[in-house]
């Protein structure tokens, strides 16, 4: 019989040290029996115990970040291309069946598994789907 439940979680950290909030949240995922893989482009020195590392360039080349710029706004906001890149990354990750996407700042309160035959997403406000959680 095919197993339809999973605890596999994937997420992304572009570069630099992991912020305290993200460290706490990643540790909460591990503490609640999630199989966490953190995709990265540069070495990470403060990884929580139990989090696995994977090469993010196997999912999406970082050079795409240089091509993502805001077209409508005259002012340059360096966070916009990063957010857009992250959106592309998580969608491609889903296409490659790498598990439930959780942003690094999602805190887990209790253990769970998810059904591989269902779709999951986050509802953010009136009529808007958010991307902190997606499968």
Question: What are the residue ranges of the model-derived segments?
Answer:
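Short, well-formed alpha-helical segments that are part of the catalytic scaffolds
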Residues: 17-31
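Active-site-proximal specificity loops/subdomain of glycosyltransferases
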Residues: 44-88
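Active-site-adjacent helix/loop patches that line small-molecule binding or acyl-intermediate pockets
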Residues: 34-42, 131-134
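Hydrophobic targeting segments
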Residues: 5-11, 29, 36-38
